[in-house]
C-alpha cells in the first residue's frame, strides 16, 4: 500500500483510509445499520492486513462504540506506532449532552474520552 505524508505533519498515512462510521453497537446511537463487533473486527483486521493504516472515526459514531471496537481490535493486532487514528470531537454524545460543541472544556473532555475508548494516549 502506498503511503503519503499527511499535510505538513510528517505523519505517513496509507493511500486509503478506512472510514469507521459503520462500525459499532447497532443498539447505541442513531444508526441501527452499523456492523456489530465481530463483523467490524473482521473488516478492520482485513484492512490492516491489506496495508490500510489510516482509520477515521468520531466520538458520536454509535455513541462511542465505534472507537471502542477500533481500540480493542488494534490493541490485539497492530502496534500503535503503525496506525494513524483520526477522530472528531464536536458531536453530541447521548449520555453527555452538555459536552458538545467546540468550547475548550468540551474539546479537552472529548479528546480524553476518545483516547480512553481508543485505548491509546495519542
What are these regions (language model features)?
Residues 47, 88, 117:
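Conserved catalytic core of Hanks-type protein kinase domains
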Residues 69-73, 88, 106-113:
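Generic beta-strand or strand-like secondary-structure segments
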Residues 27, 94-122:
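Glycine/proline-rich, positively charged
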Residues 22, 89-91:
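Active-site-proximal loop/turn and secondary-structure-junction residues that shape catalytic pockets
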Residues 1-84:
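N-terminal binding-site loop/beta-alpha segment at the start of enzyme catalytic domains
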Residues 12, 46, 90, 98-100:
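Residue-identity detector for glutamine
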Amino acid at each position: 500500500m502506498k503511503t503519503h505524508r499527511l499535510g505538513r505533519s510528517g505523519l505517513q498515512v496509507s493511500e486509503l483510509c478506512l472510514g469507521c462510521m459503520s462500525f459499532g453497537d447497532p443498539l447505541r446511537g442513531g444508526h441501527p445499520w452499523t456492523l456489530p463487533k465481530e463483523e467490524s473486527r473482521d473488516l478492520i483486521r482485513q484492512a490492516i492486513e491489506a496495508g490500510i493504516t489510516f482509520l477515521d472515526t468520531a466520538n458520536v459514531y454509535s455513541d462511542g462504540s465505534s472507537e471502542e471496537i477500533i481500540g480493542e481490535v488494534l490493541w490485539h493486532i497492530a502496534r500503535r506506532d503503525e496506525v494513524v487514528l483520526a477522530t472528531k470531537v464536536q458531536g453530541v454524545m447521548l449520555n453527555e449532552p452538555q459536552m458538545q460543541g467546540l468550547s475548550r472544556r468540551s474539546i479537552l473532555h472529548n479528546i480524553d474520552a476518545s483516547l480512553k475508548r481508543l485505548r491509546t494516549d495519542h
